Amino acid sequence: MAEGFFRSKKGFTVVQNEITRDAKISLKAKGLYLVIQAYISMPDKKWTKEDFRNLTKEGKKAFDSAWKELKDFGYLKVHFMPDNGKWKTEYELLDEPDLGPHTLYHNSEGEVII
């Protein structure tokens, strides 16, 4: 019998193997990573943390725990950018973990200051 193969699909999400093989990350956090990855590539939409919380059936505590885990293990960065006297928040989902600080503040030129 010939080796089997998967039929190709349209509209699918590709996830880096790094997080799927990371034994330190819970299945809950991996699931949240997958959900975020599936949506952030959609054109003409800016996604917020609250949007993703509303897409899941987990309660606030479970969602926040998975969110924190992604930050703590370097898969999610939070950038604070100055915007007319306030801070604008931008999230960055990483393909590979970066164990440096997960929260970064930028000056008006976009340079990291903290």
Label every PLM stretch briefly.
Residues 19-29, 36-91:
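Winged helix-turn-helix DNA-binding recognition segment
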Residues 14-15, 35, 78, 112:
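Extended aliphatic helical segments
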Residues 1-9, 77:
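N-terminal leader segment of winged-helix/HTH proteins
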Residues 93-114:
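Charged low-complexity intrinsically disordered patches
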